UniProtKB/Swiss-Prot annotation:
CDD domains found in the cross-reference section: Mrs2_Mfm1p-like (cd12823)
Subcellular location: Membrane
Protein name: Putative magnesium transporter MRS2-D
Family according to the record: Belongs to the CorA metal ion transporter (MIT) (TC 1.A.35.5) family.
Positions in coiled-coil regions: none
Gene: MRS2-D
Keyword Magnesium: yes
Annotated region described as Disordered, given as residue ranges: 1-21, 126-171, 279-311
Organism: Oryza sativa subsp. indica (Rice)
Species lineage: Eukaryota, Viridiplantae, Streptophyta, Embryophyta, Tracheophyta
Biased composition (Basic and acidic residues): 279-291
Length: 434
């Protein structure tokens, strides 16, 4: 059965897509639903034809595989530039961006649905031109259509911004150029990923700090279990944030990877190269038929210079670098917040360990006191046992034998106390007891 697609206009009440569909958000904010390879065998080939991606990139964005990788904490974060598309795999922000549309897998996922809505709203807002509220020269942008063609469109940044940036626009030669479609879509994905991670971090902080403070005041099994769960979540979120930060840092350090993300300029470059090659082949055919023109050599040299002047594809990556740097700073701030929370958890653990060590020292001191008392009591019992031996001695026949028993008992008790106090004094001098 052939693959089916339903095109839904932007803003219309479209029915919810079935599980596994890929909503395609276009440059004008419209949405079409492309069937997933789970439902149709030929749909995978259709997605590969539309995006030019290899199967491994589509498998990396598969919701089932992503869920399994996320559960095992080994899911990678990557922004990969291909020939005709950009693969975005940043935590919950998973999308395939082309020069004219954005494909998002698993739209029924509650964590992904806000990304689709944000893409439709932001891309539709960026594609709709609005008149400038001030008489300053209008700022021109580039609007990308469904077919990948580029047409100039006017954009406005609002009254205050236009008035404040009027001189800057004149200095730059007529205003700022609007970002290409793939950069606007990439910005939405980056913002969604950074905001979702920041929201998770804020939620964790609101739960962690009170729980840690309560643990320091009262060490109990319930509080320890809460802190253990918080620490597990902290490790998981820190890993995701670190992966996103590392990917942005890798892109900022590699100009070739950033150049691969310029899809619109790449299409324009390929189109211009095709025209140049076509003209060159026509001129070569014409020169081969015209032997006099070949002997002159003037036109041929000029054509060679034109072809040689084409050079390789090397776009200006300043705009993309500024875009990535802004979100790199944001995700780095989130990572710093998590690092601060991790340090607070470690400080709390150290404080709890010191409290437990203090309690353990007190128990050890109590054990020393009890052991010493037991030793002294054993000595007193030994002396009493000696006097209790059933052996007749002369003391029993003495008239003062009735007064000897209280004296002997008092002497045993006094000797035991003196021996116990002497042991405590020795312990204090040796530093065993405080």
């Amino acid at each position: 059965m052939a693959a089916r697609r339903r095109h839904v206009a932007a803003g219309a009440g479209a029915p919810a897509p079935a599980a596994g569909e890929w909503p395609a958000v276009t440059a004008g904010g419209g949405a079409a639903w492309a069937l997933s390879p789970v439902e149709e065998v030929g749909t995978k080939q259709e997605l590969m034809r539309r995006t030019g991606l290899p199967p491994r990139d589509l498998r990396a964005l598969d919701p089932a595989l992503s869920s399994a990788a996320s559960a095992s904490s080994c899911r990678p974060s990557a922004i990969t530039g291909r020939d005709r598309a950009v693969v975005v795999n940043l935590d919950r922000a998973r999308a395939v961006i082309t020069a004219s549309e954005v494909l998002v897998p698993s739209p029924r996922d509650p964590a992904v649905a806000p990304l689709v809505r944000e893409l439709r709203a932001r891309l539709a807002l960026a594609a709709s031109p609005t008149p400038a509220p001030s008489p300053s020269p209008p700022q021109h942008g580039m609007a990308v259509g469904m077919d990948g063609s580029i047409s100039p469109s006017q954009a406005s940044r609002g009254g205050e911004e236009a008035a404040g940036n009027g001189k800057d626009g004149e200095a730059l030669g007529g205003g700022d150029k609007a970002l290409p479609f793939e950069f606007r879509a990439l910005e939405v994905c980056l913002e969604f990923a950074c905001k979702s991670l920041e929201h998770e971090t804020c939620t964790l902080e609101k739960e962690a700090y009170p729980a840690l403070d309560e643990l320091t005041s009262k060490v109990s099994t319930l509080n320890l279990e809460r802190v253990r769960q918080i620490k597990s979540r902290l490790v998981a979120i820190s890993g995701k944030v670190q992966k996103v930060r590392d990917e942005l840092e890798h892109l900022l350090d590699d100009d070739m990877d950033m150049a691969a993300l310029h899809l619109t300029e790449k299409l324009a470059y390929q189109s211009s190269r095709f025209d140049i090659d076509k003209e060159a082949s026509e001129l070569e055919d014409h020169s081969s038929r015209d032997e006099e023109g070949v002997e002159g050599g003037g036109g041929g040299d000029g054509d060679d210079e034109t072809i040689a002047g084409g050079g390789s594809f090397s776009p200006n990556t300043d705009e993309l670098e500024i875009l990535l740097e802004s979100y790199f700073v944001q995700i780095d701030g989130t990572l710093n917040s998590l690092s601060t929370l991790r340090e607070y958890v470690e400080d709390t653990e150290d404080y709890i360990n010191m409290m437990l060590d203090e309690k353990q020292n007190q128990l050890l001191q109590m054990g020393i006191l009890l052991s010493t008392g037991t030793l002294v009591s054993s000595c007193a019992i030994a002396v009493t046992g000696v006097f209790g031996i059933n052996v007749h001695i002369s003391l029993y026949d003495s008239p003062a034998s009735s007064a000897a028993f209280p004296c002997a008992a008092a002497g045993i008790v006094a000797g035991s106390l003196a021996l116990y106090l002497a042991a405590l004094l020795c312990y204090k001098r040796a530093g065993i007891l405080q």
